[in-house]
Amino acid sequence: MGRVITFAGLPYREAATGVKRAPITGGDMKEMSAEVIRVARGAALTEDVPEGSDRYLFTLTGGATVSGRDRSLALAEETFAVIEEGTTLTVTNPNAGETTLISVLAPPANSPKRPGFSGGIVAAARSTTPVHAVPAEKKQRIYFVGKGAAASERAHAMIVVYVKDTVTSLHMHPNAESMFVFLSGKTRFTVGGKDVIVERGQATYFPTGDRHGLRVAEGDGVSFLEFHVPAAFVTVKD
């Protein structure tokens, strides 16, 4: 069953000095493993990306520096980074305030392998990445993985923007898992057959075959970061 996650209420644990992390997804998700990582000013986290997995990082609040494979990239707020398997990755926070990151492994370690991202480390800021209009659906999309962005068969990731009357009807993915991280506005989301209102600071996730739908709850629109894992997903509408 799909779940609603509120980041402020998660059970954070200290992963390194000045670094706390907590899981978003649970054992019901087999294709992706997601967590929130909070990095204090001047703190750093170093770890390896497992073989067979892509690592995705999104700066939800604040900025960060991501280093690995003899490359270092500065990430502004709302920037998406893609990191190749086997990379020894270091994330640091050079800024004055705490940085909050959304971290995703697709798939988790020791999973069946699919061709993944092979470009080392790349990053794309929301503010400078092309926006693709989908007039028939009253949506805009900003692609980070797939659709001409970073190439991988392990996931599809994008920011989606709705206007006030955009509606995505109930549907499910029989061959993929989904996660939504809310960035702006209030969204009316059908989770487990019930409508809930979600906003920034929250996420929803759905195991394979779990029905969900969404629309703007109030105001002029919403935006959210959306993952489907793996990339070759099928959508079945009610």
Regions flagged by a language model, labelled:
Residues 1-33, 46, 96-155, 169, ...:
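A short, N-terminal "cap"/entry segment at the start of jelly-roll beta-barrel domains
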Residues 38-39, 49-66, 159-163, 172-189, ...:
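Short, conserved beta-strand element in jelly-roll/cupin
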Residues 44-46, 50, 79-81, 85-91, ...:
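Histidine-centered metal-chelating micro-motifs
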Residues 49-51, 94-96, 155, 172-173, ...:
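Short glycine/proline-enriched turns and hinge-like loops at secondary-structure junctions
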Residues 56, 70-85, 193-209:
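Short acidic-glycine-tyrosine-enriched beta hairpin
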Residues 63-65, 88, 98, 186-188, ...:
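Structural motif
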Residues 94-95, 197-199, 210-221:
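Catalytic core of Fe(II)/2-oxoglutarate
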